Amino acid sequence: MDKKLEPIVQALQEKYTTSIEEFRDEVHIFIKAEQIVDVLTLLRDKYDFELLSALTASDYWPQQSPRFHVIYQLSSIARNITVQLRVPVNGDQPKIPTATRVYDVANWRERELLDMFGIEVEGHPDPRRILMPEGTEGHPLRKDFPLGYEEPQFTFNIKEIDLRKPYAKE
């Protein structure tokens, strides 16, 4: 573990319920969903992690508890360090609290979590789909999403897709 990161990890372990995994010089800190906003605020305000450089999820289907890990990658430019926070989330009704009050950049990334993985973000200011058209069923980055499906029609590709569709002939 990076020497600059050790006191930060130790402070998180003392104050929050965490577990740590290290793999190839990367440190992953596991945080409970109900603690993530407090941890993000602490890291931003006390330890200069001013940049939320990534926010995504990983699906561990068919495992259900936890099925997902929501992954926050934070960077401190002043300290030249990066840390990954992982929030395990169950598969039945996946929910996490919004981080938009801590990092504005979380807005669209959290909408992507809802759209692509079906992870509900509680308290989000604009919980609309961001990538898929309204009315799309399912969440394409889930491992149980069917691979053979009809391509969604957007305004720019309606004619192109229409030409490929088989229509009933009389």
PLM segments and residue spans:
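Terminal low-complexity/charged segments
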Residues: 1-170
